[in-house]
Amino acid sequence: MIATTRDREGATMITFRLRLPCRTILRVFSRNSLVRGTDRLEAVVMLLAVTVSLLTIPFAAAAGTAVHDSRSHVYAHQAQTRHPATATVIDHEGVIDSNTTATSAPPRTKITVPARWVVNGIERSGEVNAKPGTKSGDRVGIWVDSAGQLVDEPAPPARAIADAALAALGLWLSVAAVAGALLALTRAILIRVRNASWQHDIDSLFCTQR
């Protein structure tokens, strides 16, 4: 339930209240003769599903924290050991121009071209990413490690937060999905049991009237 109140200074405050169906739960587990055994079993499975989902939250948070610490270390190491450099495109025949691509194909945003670069006085060469239309002699920006080897651009440190959130959410959703699937399966089975019981009672009623 959402309630709106005002403090002494006149500021509006919105509060949220979560009300659990305590009366319904107590009624299900009471000795009421109208409550069937299948109703009690369904309530037990539902409570277990909710309990397991809630108990998974701290474990998911712990997993997210572990992922955050691990990825933060990795990304910090990348930021320290990877450096930008400039490579010169070589071998013009190997360059694919954007005008030579098929008209039916989607436009390409990157191509791979041969290039060479110098780090710490040592010349190296390899395939680097470039824009379509890049020609021999053009310069492109690359990232290299301490040894001068070509590497990917270092990930931003903020990505560790996203990785942690995805890990925690993925773990919780997996457990919640399993709990929900078991609850749905239990409900489907109990519905068949109830229908069979009702059919049996109806058949018995007709037999009695005859």
UniProtKB/Swiss-Prot annotation:
<keyword id="KW-0812">Transmembrane</keyword>
<keyword id="KW-1003">Cell membrane</keyword>
<feature type="transmembrane region" description="Helical">
    <location>
        <begin position="43"/>
        <end position="63"/>
    </location>
</feature>
<feature type="transmembrane region" description="Helical">
    <location>
        <begin position="165"/>
        <end position="185"/>
    </location>
</feature>
<dbReference type="GO" id="GO:0005886">
    <property type="term" value="C:plasma membrane"/>
</dbReference>
<keyword id="KW-1133">Transmembrane helix</keyword>
<dbReference type="InterPro" id="IPR039708">
    <property type="entry name" value="MT1774/Rv1733c-like"/>
</dbReference>
<keyword id="KW-0472">Membrane</keyword>
<protein>
    <recommendedName>
        <fullName>Probable membrane protein MT1774</fullName>
    </recommendedName>
</protein>
